[in-house]
């Protein structure tokens, strides 16, 4: 048995997030498009002898040996970051187990034959059987793009949030500095986050927040050891209201201390967010890494659209 690690890029516009949705009466199995679902179907077509079929789907296990929702004719995969509905990625990571002898370097071309044009496997590597994309050491890097032009650029409308209010970038940078480090980010997490239901906490570490200008776009790049449900989008919404003068940069300290979602800013739309990269550098220790803690249901996804 071999374990294959995939680096995946996708345009999330037409998908209800990464994770396969549990079927409901309104949305029967297979009717809700997800990145994981498309990838599992593609692998099932590429490796039909290893695909899960019929009753076997009820007992299928993914590489972490934990049951994942699968449909007949698919090969289960586990992803590193379970992105929300409408969120994009340049470097998400997933892995699957296989007995195939296909060289790892040949998997991208082979899998991409069965994927829609808005999802692509960019790279494949064979890894050790104890590699887990979600729990081994890594950091996540996200970017949120804001179109700050007077008129929205039609070519970036699916990838940047058009925001026309005046912004003071020095105020935004001052506020961002207050967020760097280890904090309890409860005020910056959607209260529906399942991490709270499972007895977890909102303590995470943000390594850096960079505020960049690219023409009429403002790019907010955030690196950290893990992010919770809507956390980045709430952080960006908070930085924007500080940037246009409705709150002060030092109010970040009060928000963090309050541990109350109502004290922070709004949740900005999903389409401006992109998962840029996952770093599996050994310099980041396993203790530093925090899982995002959330599975995404249709009800949760509906709030992000």
Feature annotation, model-predicted:
Residues 1-305:
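Structured-RNA-binding interfaces characteristic of tRNA pseudouridine synthases
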């Amino acid at each position: 048995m071999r374990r294959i690690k995939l680096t995946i890029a996708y345009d999330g516009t037409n998908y209800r997030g990464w994770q396969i949705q549990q079927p409901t009466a309104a949305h029967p199995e297979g009717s809700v498009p997800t990145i994981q679902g498309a990838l599992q179907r593609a692998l099932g077509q590429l490796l039909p002898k290893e695909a899960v079929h019929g009753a076997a789907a009820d007992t299928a296990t993914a590489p972490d040996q934990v049951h994942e929702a699968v449909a007949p004719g698919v090969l289960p995969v586990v992803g590193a970051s379970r992105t929300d509905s409408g969120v994009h990625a340049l470097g998400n990571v997933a892995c699957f187990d296989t007995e195939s002898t296909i060289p790892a370097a040949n998997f991208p071309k082979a899998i991409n034959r069965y994927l829609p044009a808005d999802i692509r496997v960019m790279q494949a590597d064979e890894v050790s059987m104890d590699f887990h994309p979600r729990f081994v050491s890594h950091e996540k890097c996200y970017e949120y793009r804001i179109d700050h032009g007077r008129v929205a650029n039609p070519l970036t409308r699916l990838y940047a949030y058009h925001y026309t209010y005046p912004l003071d970038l020095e105020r935004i940078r001052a506020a961002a500095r207050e967020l760097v480090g280890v904090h309890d980010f409860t005020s910056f997490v959607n209260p529906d986050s399942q991490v709270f239901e499972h007895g977890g906490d909102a303590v995470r570490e943000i390594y850096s927040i960079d505020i960049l200008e690219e023409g009429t776009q403002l790019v907010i790049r955030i690196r950290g050891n893990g992010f919770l449900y809507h956390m980045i989008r709430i952080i960006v919404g908070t930085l924007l209201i500080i940037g246009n003068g409705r709150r002060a940069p030092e109010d970040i300290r009060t928000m963090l201390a309050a541990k109350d979602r109502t004290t922070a800013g709004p949740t900005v739309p999903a389409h401006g967010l992109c998962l840029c990269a996952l770093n599996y550098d050994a310099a980041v220790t396993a203790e530093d890494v925090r899982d995002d803690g959330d599975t995404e249901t249709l009800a949760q996804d509906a709030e992000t659209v």
